[in-house]
């Protein structure tokens, strides 16, 4: 039975990742600052900023999925966010390399593109935003994610470890769909995330597929649903909120996501299964 350590497994996404790996027959260890609300697997309380503790919790693992982080900008002092997110990721990858672990998945973010937490509202250079889009954050959170992706590149160069960095869209647990009717008809809401989202169950499956994939090297992948989180068609969203953007790389038919997931689908053989439209009744009104 392969063993995977999930850091941040007690969190909103982490608990779904833990659940998915357990259901697929993996031995799972949750490494976090608190225990899981339901005992899906063994939990180890760990400070990821302490390299020795990280070595201890990763010992014997075949793979690590690193989700633990300060998850947004401006919730903590900027330097605290940067230090925590960068050092914890460095320690996880450094310890994994030292222990001979060959597979890692780390949580990056769509925030690295620079739109989400910009001081003044800015639009994308083109849509759908793919992994080649410039990353121009103005905040320590987005910058920390770029540094983490570069740490992944370095570890791969040095050791050959496969490290997949997920630039996650807005992560949505199933119980959050009840809030969607409050915003799906208002283009002004959620514009900074380009109206993207990803169901926790689809993100969890992507984590497993990345662990099971071979030959990816160090690669960053957008993880988003196929559709936007809005009832308004995607072209209308862009015309209403970002009329200055004229570079459309696809036809933007219907409600196509403005955060491209094509690379992840191709490399991981992954297909998002969960859409908010299947959970929310009467959204067309």
Where are these regions (language model features)?
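A conserved pocket-lining segment of Rossmann-fold NAD(P)-dependent short-chain dehydrogenase/reductase
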Residues: 131-138, 165-198
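Catalytic helix-loop patch of NAD(P)-dependent Rossmann-fold dehydrogenases
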Residues: 83, 119-159, 190
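NAD(P)H-binding glycine-rich loop region in Rossmannoid oxidoreductase-like domains
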Residues: 37, 46-84
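C-terminal substrate-binding subdomain of Rossmann-fold SDR/epimerase-dehydratase oxidoreductases
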Residues: 201-285
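Conserved Rossmann-fold NAD(P)-dependent oxidoreductase catalytic core, especially the SDR/UDP-sugar
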Residues: 91-138
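N-terminal Rossmann NAD(P)H-binding glycine-rich loop of SDR-like oxidoreductase domains
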Residues: 4-24
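Glycine/proline-rich active-site loop of Rossmann-fold NAD(P)-dependent oxidoreductases
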Residues: 158-162, 173-185, 209-220
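NAD(P)-cofactor binding segment of oxidoreductase domains
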Residues: 64, 76-105
């Amino acid at each position: 039975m392969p063993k995977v350590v999930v850091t941040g497994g007690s969190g909103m996404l982490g608990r779904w990742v833990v659940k998915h790996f357990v259901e697929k027959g993996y031995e799972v260890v949750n490494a976090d600052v608190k225990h899981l609300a339901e005992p899906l697997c063994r939990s180890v309380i760990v400070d990821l900023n302490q390299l020795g503790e990280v070595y201890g919790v990763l010992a014997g693992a075949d793979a690590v999925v690193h989700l633990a982080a300060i998850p947004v900008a401006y919730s903590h002092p900027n330097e605290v966010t940067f230090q925590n997110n960068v050092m914890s990721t460095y320690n996880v990858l450094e310890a994994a390399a030292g222990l001979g672990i060959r597979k890692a998945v780390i949580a990056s973010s769509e925030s690295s593109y620079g739109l989400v937490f910009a001081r003044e509202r800015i639009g994308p250079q083109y849509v759908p935003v793919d992994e080649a889009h410039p990353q121009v954050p103005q905040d320590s959170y987005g910058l920390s994610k770029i540094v983490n992706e570069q740490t992944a590149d370095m570890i791969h160069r040095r050791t050959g470890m496969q490290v997949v960095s997920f630039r996650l869209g807005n992560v949505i647990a199933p119980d959050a769909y009840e809030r969607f009717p409050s915003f799906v008809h208002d283009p002004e809401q959620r514009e900074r995330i380009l109206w993207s989202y990803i169901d926790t169950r689809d993100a969890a499956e992507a984590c497993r597929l990345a662990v099971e994939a071979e030959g990816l090297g160090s690669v960053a992948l957008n993880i988003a649903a196929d559709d936007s989180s809005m009832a308004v068609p995607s072209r209308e969203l862009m015309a209403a909120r970002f009329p200055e953007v004229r570079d459309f790389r696809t036809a933007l038919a219907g409600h196509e996501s403005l955060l491209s997931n094509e690379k992840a689908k191709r490399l991981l053989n992954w297909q998002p299964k969960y859409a908010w439209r299947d959970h929310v009744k009467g959204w067309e009104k």
